[in-house]
Amino acid sequence: MAGHSKWANIKHRKGAQDALKAKIFNKFSKEIMVAVAKGGSDPNSNPALRLIISKARAKSMPKSNIEKAIAKGEGSTSNGENFKEIIYSGTLSHGISVIVVILTDNINRAIASLQALFRRANGQIGKQNSIPYLFEQKGYLEIEKNNLDEDDLMLFSLDNGAEDFQSDEENYMIYCQPRKISELKNEIEKKFSPNFRAVEISYFPNEWVELDQENTEKILNQIDNFLDDEDIQNVYHNLKFA
């Protein structure tokens, strides 16, 4: 079944590719360190680490960077354990809802920065660790089409725990329950050896808000400002854009 990729509307990233990759890799490194500190350095016995490594590889993070992050996590366990994940909901102008995921070793600094970001965006910060009913958490796999047969991949995915399957001109998009993502990804990898473009557990909106081009660009610039903050890992939103 064909459909528009929801993912393109949820996670917006800047176009300066080199700087962008460096920021993304730094965020992955921090997640890897925390996962190692909590569950050890062996991905086979640490599902959280295994998922993060899959995410990082899907975004072309070099193997050497991943290994360095694992080594840092092993060598500085106390530092890894000091990182805390907190989630804030909030609204920007024009009724755009956001979920902001923070991973920080200084909660007071992170919250102060977040409050300032919402003020500058003329938005309103919500409660900590409260997820609006507008969003649902799902596992998400994005796979390059290449020469993969759509029907074969769709049927195999649905037989192995996928809940939805979509496609656009370049990619297949597969959705599942968060607890199923590692198993589903592994089964697809063994069967098809595809090129994964994304492996994520993410928040997807149940309702979208569509704005004119001028206001869409303003909101996207505000989201960029959030993502520039060193403590902010991800921003999910319900703004629909082309």
From Swiss-Prot:
It is found in: Cytoplasm. InterPro entries: Integrase-like_N (IPR017856), TACO1_YebC-like_2nd/3rd_dom (IPR048300), TACO1_YebC_N (IPR049083), Transcrip_reg_TACO1-like (IPR002876), Transcrip_reg_TACO1-like_dom3 (IPR026564), YebC-like (IPR029072). It comes from Mesomycoplasma hyopneumoniae (strain 232) (Mycoplasma hyopneumoniae). The keyword Coiled coil does not apply. One of its GO terms (molecular function) is DNA binding. This is Probable transcriptional regulatory protein mhp472. One of its GO terms (biological process) is regulation of DNA-templated transcription. Keywords: Cytoplasm, DNA-binding, Transcription, Transcription regulation. Its main location: cytoplasm. The lineage of its organism: Bacteria, Bacillati, Mycoplasmatota, Mycoplasmoidales, Metamycoplasmataceae. Pfam families: TACO1_YebC_N (PF20772), Transcrip_reg (PF01709). The keyword Signal does not apply. Belongs to the TACO1 family. GO terms for cellular component: cytosol.
